From Swiss-Prot:
Record gene name: rpmG
SUPFAM superfamilies listed in its UniProt record: Zn-binding ribosomal proteins
Record-level GO BP terms: translation
Protein name: Large ribosomal subunit protein bL33
Domain of life: Bacteria
Entry's family note: Belongs to the bacterial ribosomal protein bL33 family.
InterPro entries associated with the record: Ribosomal_bL33 (IPR001705), Ribosomal_bL33_CS (IPR018264), Ribosomal_bL33_sf (IPR038584), Ribosomal_zn-bd (IPR011332)
Gene Ontology CC annotation, any one: cytoplasm
Annotated GO MF terms: structural constituent of ribosome
Length: 55
């Protein structure tokens, strides 16, 4: 069987609240780490979320 094209990665809040999103990423096309501005409900603001390894 072939390897799947996408992997799951965790986007963790930079506000140190512990809040995170799990998203799919194609490592062949996107070699850099992902960073998005998303909503963190624990601080009730949009903050940067950075990619970390999903354990």
């Amino acid at each position: 069987m072939a390897k799947p094209a996408t992997i799951l990665v965790k986007l963790e809040s930079t506000a140190d609240t512990g809040y995170f999103y799990v998203v799919k990423k194609n490592p062949r096309k996107t070699t850099n780490k992902l960073e998005f501005n998303k909503y963190d409900p624990r601080v009730r603001k949009h903050v940067p979320f950075r990619e970390t390894k999903l354990k």
